[in-house]
């Protein structure tokens, strides 16, 4: 199993990054909260990975540290939460924000995440709260106050389609993704900024 990759970033297409390690290019799906922290193209990055096998595909998910990966591993064990939804959850809010929301039973915050309805949010609170007790690290032992970001203005017309596609990949419906992008669209920002602001506005 591939647990860690160290290599150079060849491509960045949210939420996918192509990382070259020892001459091999690995396509890694990353939560947008982790994607934002990646270095620029051509620079070296270290990614902690989780290999997921499906009937129709073999996918590699990546994270900036082991605690984020541990959280992802526990999320996909929750009934009704697969890798795609787990990725969307950790894209909509940071790992720390999610832990805080669960600990404080913030159902209203969780239902704003893509693909998370009231029943799923309630299930996340019930199941994940118990799972946190068995995990090590500051992330799971320090429930800080959740910070809900405010909407920011950003976008460039030639980046809007790319941003909308990334939101669809994270679980939003095409029409909803386009509406989210249009709502915060303003000339002057790249695709990554557009995606980040759209997700912030959704909260």
Swiss-Prot record:
InterPro entries: DNA_helicase_Holl-junc_RuvA_I, Hlx-hairpin-Hlx_DNA-bd_motif, NA-bd_OB-fold, RuvA, RuvA_2-like, RuvA_C, RuvA_C_sf
Region described as Domain I: 1-64
Source taxon at top rank: Bacteria
Region (Flexible linker) residue spans: 143-154
UniProt key word Repeat: no
Pfam family, one: HHH_5
Localization in the cell: Cytoplasm
Region span, Domain III: 155-203
One GO BP: DNA recombination
Record-level Gene Ontology MF annotations: ATP binding; four-way junction DNA binding; four-way junction helicase activity
Keywords annotated in UniProt: Cytoplasm, DNA damage, DNA recombination, DNA repair, DNA-binding
Role played: The RuvA-RuvB-RuvC complex processes Holliday junction (HJ) DNA during genetic recombination and DNA repair, while the RuvA-RuvB complex plays an important role in the rescue of blocked DNA replication forks via replication fork reversal (RFR). RuvA specifically binds to HJ cruciform DNA, conferring on it an open structure. The RuvB hexamer acts as an ATP-dependent pump, pulling dsDNA into and through the RuvAB complex. HJ branch migration allows RuvC to scan DNA until it finds its consensus sequence, where it cleaves and resolves the cruciform DNA.
Entry similarity comment: Belongs to the RuvA family.
HAMAP family: DNA_HJ_migration_RuvA
Domain notes: Has three domains with a flexible linker between the domains II and III and assumes an 'L' shape. Domain III is highly mobile and contacts RuvB.
Protein name: Holliday junction branch migration complex subunit RuvA
């Amino acid at each position: 199993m591939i647990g860690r990759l160290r290599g150079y970033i060849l491509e960045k297409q949210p939420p996918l990054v192509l990382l070259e390690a020892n001459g091999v290019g690995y396509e890694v799906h990353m939560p947008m909260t982790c994607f934002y922290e990646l270095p620029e193209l051509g620079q070296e990055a270290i990614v902690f990975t989780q290999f997921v096998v499906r009937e129709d595909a073999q996918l590699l998910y990546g994270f900036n540290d082991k605690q984020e990966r541990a959280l992802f591993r526990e999320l996909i064990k929750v009934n009704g939460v697969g890798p795609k939804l787990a990725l969307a959850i950790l894209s909509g809010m940071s790992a720390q924000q999610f832990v805080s929301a669960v600990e404080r039973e913030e159902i209203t915050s969780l239902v704003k995440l893509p693909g998370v309805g009231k029943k799923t949010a309630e299930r996340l609170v019930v199941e994940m709260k118990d799972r946190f007790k068995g995990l090590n690290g500051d992330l799971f032992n320090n429930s800080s106050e959740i910070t809900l970001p405010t909407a920011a203005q950003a976008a460039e017309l030639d980046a809007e389609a790319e941003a909308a596609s990334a939101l669809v990949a994270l679980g939003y419906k095409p029409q909803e993704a386009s509406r989210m992008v249009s709502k915060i669209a303003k000339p002057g920002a790249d695709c990554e900024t557009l995606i980040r602001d759209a997700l912030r506005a959704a909260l």
